[in-house]
């Protein structure tokens, strides 16, 4: 089911090395009165959440997104108003899909969790996540609460590429999937097996590629909502049942988006509010930060076709807020301080590939014991990441480095296929704070550069504070800068600005990343006593 790189202008997710992203976040300051906000501003979440699926269960909205090589995968976002979002959990607790996701002999960069689907089944009050991995098979995970626990229900031999799961009004389960040729599968009543699949639509050559299926039944009609990567959205409609025949209509094409320098809103899904209004939660290409969710109201023609409501011919930067009941509580902001108390990581965090769980712990800070001996950060296990908040944000880490050993490297990175970091190195008993740049990959995601030091300074034995500031406004490469402090108050800039590229091909955007790896021998450790993600 993979396609060649020569067709990338038609579909930007067509090779083994290509894929898709996620959805979540809060835009307005925490504590802003929901009732007082008569309008909202796009993007509703300025963080990297692509390939969104969105549903409502009662008075709560949930969204799912791609995560590729990050673990746990497939975050579930929660909102009470479609505007303010939090991360509630992850549908895929561990990337249990082969050794490469453990960085064991091979690597899973830009593989893993691509566009997938989230649904709720009222008959058994269960959430379902369904997605294909590595074009080999489809996995289904279920939970009775989005926080988890999520458990694998089944694997299905057909890889449902870009799947949309529909729970029909008679409780039947259907999956729409495919690239250009769109198919519909019916699952067994228990959701464990495929009982039927057939092609239902072939995309006209004049349109090119359609993928990213979302599957709906609305007023007795069946709809498959499809994207033309990365500048269009189309919809198929059938009045004859889930297997068609379907007719196609364009929803949007080359529509001006709400973010200066960003792309066309596309993909994502439709959701209906309690009062019957409809909204489209799409994403906007906004590199170097990734793909960020944008929300627009939708109306319907008399003959049952969706129409996105525009502002001056474009996807609005602002719209009237959805009319929804007062939220039962404020959502947890996606920025702020984490002191790593308790027994688990908060769901805002995702590891680069699966972690070695014997080598980290939380409670009284985050302890990272070295898990890998390598000079290549891209091979190092237990690198812990957070999405960057746009348009600009700063990550500050308080680091206890007293248990580092010779050869260890620990710090704070701006992580993507071209990376840089500020951190503490210990060599020959000497501890320094350094900036390293030149960590690079090729387009097959193999390491081409392990980095080189561009600045350094001595540090005393006490804690050190490391800071990275990232500008992720789209449309051009943007600067990331690093600084450090020995008292937590006065910060000193270290090294030149790092240019974060805005090419889309890694799919996932830049992230802040905490790391600690050995270059000589295991046994060292660091403790992160405080992390803060802040905006100007």
Predicted features along the sequence, with ranges:
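Structural motif
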Residues: 72-73, 137-139, 183-186, 232-236, ...
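N-terminal secretory signal peptides
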Residues: 1-10, 18-30, 34
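Beta-propeller domains
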Residues: 65-92
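Conserved blade-ending motifs and adjacent loop-strand segments that build the rim/top face
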Residues: 250-268, 497-503
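Hydrophobic core segments of beta-strands in well-ordered, beta-rich domains
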Residues: 55-70, 77, 108, 113-133, ...
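Blade-edge beta-strand/turn elements of extracellular beta-propeller
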Residues: 38-44, 85-93, 100-105, 141-158, ...
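Conserved Ser/Thr-centered positions that define the repeating blades of beta-propeller domains
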Residues: 79, 142-143, 187, 236-240, ...
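Extracellular glycan-recognition regions
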Residues: 296, 304-306, 310-536
